[in-house]
Amino acid sequence: MSRPDSAVSLLPDYSLRAHNTFGFDARARVAARIGSPGQFASLARDPRVAGLDRLVLGGGSNVVFTRDFDGLVLLDEIRGRALVREDDGAWYVEAGGGENWHAFVEWTLAEGMPGLENLALIPGTVGAAPIQNIGAYGLEMKEHFASLRAVDLATGELVEFDAARCAFGYRDSFFKRDGRGRFAIVAVTFRLPKAWTPRIGYADVARELAARGIDARAARARDVFDAVVAIRRAKLPDPLALGNAGSFFKNPVIDAQAFAALRAREPDIVSYPQPDGRVKLAAGWLIDRCGWKGRALGAAAVHERQALVLVNLGGASGADVLALAHAIRRDVLGRFGVELEMEPVCL
């Protein structure tokens, strides 16, 4: 699951431009490439970096740098993926924290272990997936999560986390709250049930399957994977061509009474009933209705095809993107009385 431990080389005054999908040219006071859990642990006791704040970076797809990072950036490059066990009901697969998420999903399908196909093409690494509890098209990562191992960056101890300890929420977990900045996730194990049925509740997925001449009831996991990839490529910009961090805002969830009042004013509002009686709203619809889709503030803009995505047109800073985000939040709150929450971590 990783290369053997070796001495960790430190990289002073390190550019993070290639390590965040917005392409911001922030710099780290010092950085280190990490290829094993032992290397994470060794830096907990390394006098060269004693007292420095620490930041673990995988793909950098969920971070907005508003300034240089005056500390130690740990670049997670722990690789490896394997079937670690199976029983009558499921396969258990493990992947290193530095593995590319999309490549991992594609590998599980190639190995005949479906279940994660709705999460195809989400940017980032396997280690970042539990932090955000990534989700898309009717599936959240937590539904197939078994356990993870993480290094305590203060002590160097290797710690095991089950789902309860991770405290997953909507695009949220222990690692975004009490555990923020304290742990480096080095490996994640997923449980993929052998009794598989397609998740095709989202209209976009059903439409894409139909356009491909596929009966949704007979869809294979690879069909769903291909449909999701096509949808995401049509709607979302490639970060290599146009800097972005994917969905910038969470879809807000409000109580039924507030929704009834809102729908009386906005009868065509896009919404999704939740099991607990609350209602999830489509943040992109709210932003679009406020007239922000396709608009720019300087070199930061709202994408023309997906209002949830903020983009760097070239030369924007993290502060520029945050200024745009705050303007959008202000307008949505003023018109709908709904407060949008940002998904990325802002530093």
From Swiss-Prot:
It comes from the Bacteria. Pfam families: FAD_binding_4, MurB_C. GO terms for cellular component: cytosol. Coiled coil: none annotated. The active site is at R171, S247, E343. Its cofactor is FAD. Pathway: Cell wall biogenesis; peptidoglycan biosynthesis. Residues 24-195 form the FAD-binding PCMH-type domain. GO terms for biological process: cell division; cell wall organization; peptidoglycan biosynthetic process; regulation of cell shape. InterPro entries: FAD-bd_PCMH, FAD-bd_PCMH-like_sf, FAD-bd_PCMH_sub1, FAD-bd_PCMH_sub2, MurB, MurB_C, MurB_C_sf, Oxid_FAD_bind_N. It is found in: Cytoplasm. One of its GO terms (molecular function) is UDP-N-acetylmuramate dehydrogenase activity. It catalyses: UDP-N-acetyl-alpha-D-muramate + NADP(+) = UDP-N-acetyl-3-O-(1-carboxyvinyl)-alpha-D-glucosamine + NADPH + H(+). Keywords: Cell cycle, Cell division, Cell shape, Cell wall biogenesis/degradation, Cytoplasm, FAD, Flavoprotein, NADP, Oxidoreductase, Peptidoglycan synthesis. Its EC number is 1.3.1.98. It is an enzyme of class 1 (oxidoreductase). Cell wall formation. Belongs to the MurB family. This is UDP-N-acetylenolpyruvoylglucosamine reductase. It comes from Burkholderia mallei (strain ATCC 23344). The gene is murB.
